[in-house]
Amino acid sequence: MFSAIAKKVFGTRNDRAVKRLAKEVERINALEPEIEALSDDQLRARTEAFREQVEQGRTLDDLLPEAFAVAREASRRVLGMRHFDVQLIGGMVLHQGKIAEMKTGEGKTLVATLAVYLHALSGRGVHVVTVNDYLARRDAAWMGRIYEFLGLSVGVVVPGQSREEKKAAYEADITYGTNNEFGFDYLRDNMAFRPEDRVQRELAYAIVDEVDSILIDEARTPLIISGPAEQSSELYQQMTRIVPRLQRQEEEDGPGDYYLDEKARQAHITEEGHENIERLLQAEGLLEEGESLYDARNISLVHHLNAALRAHTLFQKDVNYLVQDNKIVIVDEFTGRAMPGRRWSEGLHQAVEAKEGVPIQSENQTLASITFQNYFRMYELLAGMTGTADTEAFEFQHIYGLEVLSIPTHKPMIRDDMTDLVYRTAREKYDAIIEDIQWCAQHDRPVLVGTTSIEASELLSKALRKAKIPHNVLNAKNHEQEAGIIANAGLPGAVTIATNMAGRGTDIVLGGNLEAELAELGEDASEEKIEQVKRDWQARHDRVIEAGGLHVIGTERHESRRIDNQLRGRAGRQGDPGSSRFYLSLEDSLLRIFASERMSGMMQRLGMEEGEAIESPMVSRVIENAQRKVEAYNFDVRKHLLDFDDVANDQRRVIYQQRRELLEADDVSETVDAMRNDVIDSVISEFIPPGSIDEQWDVAGLEETLESDFGLKLPLRQWLDEDDSLHEETLRERIHHEVEAHYRGKEELAGAEVLRQFEKAVMLQVLDKTWKDHLAAMDYLRQGIHLRGYAQRNPKQEFKREAFAMFQEMLEGLKREVVGLLCRVRVRAEEDVEAVEEQRRRQGDMQYRHAQANSLSGQGAGGEGAAGGTARGPVQQADQLPFGRKVGRNEPCPCGSGKKYKQCCGKLS
């Protein structure tokens, strides 16, 4: 209560922040007459003047008023669009590295030009991140006209470009691209075999469009570069025959082979099911008599069984995926769009392929991966913009250190958001929706009906056809018609059914899309024809406004309030009238899982008839609380994943830094010499423990190991027989001397220059191979670590401890393999070096995936394509290496061991 009174008296924190920025707007506006008076050349010359001032030490904050005034004037001259005062506030929020929440139709794309122009003056590059390639190309071409007018260069990165094209795009002052492409380019750069193969510059400043989609919804889905792993697809087909014979357990402790946890999107085998499955597997010849499913040798069976069980019980055709051209195409849960080329990981995609009877593509082994959370936290300054961020403000702050500021609208919003109507059954709900649509169509009101799945959109379309109501359907199956359907969605009486595809980034103009109509006329259209089209559009526009504007109908509440708000946001843009209402039933997923009992009891107490609905703010609150529960659960999952991924990320930073140093070094012989010395020393210590007596020595074992692992045939026993004075220290020195002599002989034969090249090539190849194997081992560790909880151990602490031990082991193994290879191999000429390089360059076999990640707690982090959040969060700033910075030898090692870098991962170099 006191908080509410204080807000009324003093205003909210958001209001106070906006007021402070409004003072800066006055300074920008005061410069407008002076800037308007400049010629085009004088305006363009300001860019170079600003750059010189930055080089002389002026900060971007100092330049902001004048730079914003210049960008606004350039936009007015080039595009005929002048930034409103509220858009200037949005630009300042982006410059400060915050998230600007701006409502639909408020011109987010134009707002970004202000901060982009200002930061491009630093010459360090600006990345503008969009959700798809179409928007990246469109915005680069559209807004690029402003930047090019002001003398700045613009690039765009999209899949399929050559290395030279990508490099040129990243060298530009401003680079547009998708989150996927920026992330994949980072991974590819860290797999490059030559310094000139890398394309990205430092990660200085980025503006993320639709920031909630990228940093929240997609945070559970890592980017993965993978290569094929040899594994038979037959096991998936055998499991897909077994799973339909299993029975679901409907109630706790009831009969059944498995039960579903729909909240966590996981399937679990019961005790009874365990026995039944073993019998079925034995009948299929997959399990020996007397063997247990959970024997160590049968881990692969458990993996395939779990994947098949999830595929059959939790993933539905036309909801979670489509079958197109004999392939499984994932449907994004949050956008409703098909995502060809994206695959679920951990065998789930293959299990769905087996279920649908389409060709099973081979599983892949991870070569490199990163989450969006850890990729975007590498930028020195990160900003974002979206129409719906306020509900996730805590997560943005907690994970990324990003503050959310709501920007006021240019015109007041007058949309009427009506309370939800809740029915007992889905049939009653759809009857009411059809009635509402009929009324709107008769009164010239356009209607947008939002559904949560392709299946629901087709079901509603069937009902509308039966009622003889003309309509358009927009879902992942007919996405190629999207532009035409959206252009006509604002016509008087138009009815459009759409999945979440229409919820984000689509602009429905009342009366239809005038620009699209004018574009259809062609360049040779007469002035009279153009004026006629404009008059017709104005008449339609006025009719729709008089009828009440666009009416948005939601057929089901989404797990996230943001997605619902995005759907509502299609109506009431730029001060237009409009309305929205959600129709729900107790059979809807959200209510069934989270709020069904309470709502059902309420309906029974009210003695409701068939077809009656509850309409009450209290009901809306119950539903909102259910959504809050899901959002809190999803946040916990994302936070949990991040805690685990941060361990892998620390290791990734160490490996990638070492790799960069290797790549940039012309001569790695000092590193190789140190490694050889360390490895030979540790091998000797294995067989001749320091400080031990002669009887404890295993000289024969040492001889054998030196020959088999390093190609060194040393007669150690003969030396000892011939020289009684040889003790541990002198024997050690003699072995080292022989090893060095052997290696120098190799150098004389091959030539120093050839051997230096070969050393570098071998080190890179072994580093990549051991890192790949380490990633696979880390994946296996993650999958089973939650079981430590049953032993009263903290899975996170156990994971950190074991992951660190595995990392240390990997580094030791890497050194031993490099030294062994270099000692054994015969380098004949430069062709050998080229052969190693060619083998390493096999980029063609790689796949680039934005793959489903599972929760590391053993609870399912995800069903479909993504859910998420990205973060600049609780990691201490000292541990966050700026891109490419070298760790000091005496600094704490970033892998988290607590040791100094030189005594830990720095040993590698």
From Swiss-Prot:
It is found in: Cell inner membrane; Cytoplasm. The keyword Membrane applies. It catalyses: ATP + H2O + cellular proteinSide 1 = ADP + phosphate + cellular proteinSide 2. Keywords: ATP-binding, Cell inner membrane, Cell membrane, Cytoplasm, Membrane, Metal-binding, Nucleotide-binding, Protein transport, Translocase, Translocation, Transport, Zinc. GO terms for molecular function: ATP binding; metal ion binding; protein-exporting ATPase activity. SUPFAM superfamilies: Helical scaffold and wing domains of SecA, P-loop containing nucleoside triphosphate hydrolases, Pre-protein crosslinking domain of SecA. GO terms for biological process: intracellular protein transmembrane transport; protein import; protein targeting; protein transport by the Sec complex. It is a peripheral membrane protein. Residues 859-871 have a biased composition (Gly residues). The keyword Electron transport does not apply. InterPro entries: Helicase_ATP-bd, Helicase_C-like, P-loop_NTPase, SEC_C_motif, SecA, SecA_CS, SecA_DEAD, SecA_motor_DEAD. Its EC number is 7.4.2.8. May bind 1 zinc ion per subunit. Zn(2+) binds at C893, C895, C904, C905. Its cofactor is Zn(2+). Residues 834-909 are annotated as: Disordered. Residues 837-848 have a biased composition (Basic and acidic residues). Monomer and homodimer. Part of the essential Sec protein translocation apparatus which comprises SecA, SecYEG and auxiliary proteins SecDF-YajC and YidC. Belongs to the SecA family. Part of the Sec protein translocase complex. Interacts with the SecYEG preprotein conducting channel. Has a central role in coupling the hydrolysis of ATP to the transfer of proteins into and across the cell membrane, serving both as a receptor for the preprotein-SecB complex and as an ATP-driven molecular motor driving the stepwise translocation of polypeptide chains across the membrane. This is Protein translocase subunit SecA. It comes from Alkalilimnicola ehrlichii (strain ATCC BAA-1101 / DSM 17681 / MLHE-1). The lineage of its organism: Bacteria, Pseudomonadati, Pseudomonadota, Gammaproteobacteria, Chromatiales.
